[in-house]
């Protein structure tokens, strides 16, 4: 049977992979969005694990709210990305300096 430590280690590994993905790839906006989503999912795994092992449903309900916000974040982020790609023909982070004043 899987213990709480197994789930916490899995969450920590996924969180570390997302941090490495953010630091190693600062060029592509799509990869940055995927790394942020992976980070949120790692936190959700920890919420569900603690909620299950403590016998409290509040953590599992909180995960549904986090997933809803993450879905909205992804939709808005990809919509902004599509507009930027149509206007600038690139998704490179270094080329997205049009907001500089």
UniProtKB/Swiss-Prot annotation:
Keywords: Cell inner membrane, Cell membrane, Membrane, NAD, Quinone, Translocase, Transmembrane, Transmembrane helix, Transport, Ubiquinone. The chain crosses the membrane at residues 4-24, 30-50, 61-81. InterPro entries: NADH_UbQ_OxRdtase_chain4L/K, NUOK/Mnh_C1-like. It is a multi-pass membrane protein. It catalyses: a quinone + NADH + 5 H(+)(in) = a quinol + NAD(+) + 4 H(+)(out). It is found in: Cell inner membrane. Its EC number is 7.1.1.-. The gene is nuoK. It comes from Cupriavidus taiwanensis (strain DSM 17343 / BCRC 17206 / CCUG 44338 / CIP 107171 / LMG 19424 / R1). Belongs to the complex I subunit 4L family. This is NADH-quinone oxidoreductase subunit K.
């Amino acid at each position: 049977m899987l213990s709480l430590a197994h789930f916490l280690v899995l969450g920590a590994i996924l969180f570390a992979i997302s941090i490495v993905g953010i630091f190693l790839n600062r060029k592509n906006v799509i990869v940055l969005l995927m790394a942020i989503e992976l980070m949120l999912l790692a936190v959700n795994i920890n919420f569900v694990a603690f909620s299950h092992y403590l016998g409290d449903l509040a953590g599992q309900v909180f995960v549904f709210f986090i997933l809803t916000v993450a879905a909205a974040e992804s939709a808005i982020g990809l919509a902004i990305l599509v507009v930027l790609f149509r206007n600038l023909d690139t998704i490179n982070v270094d080329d997205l300096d049009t907001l500089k004043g």
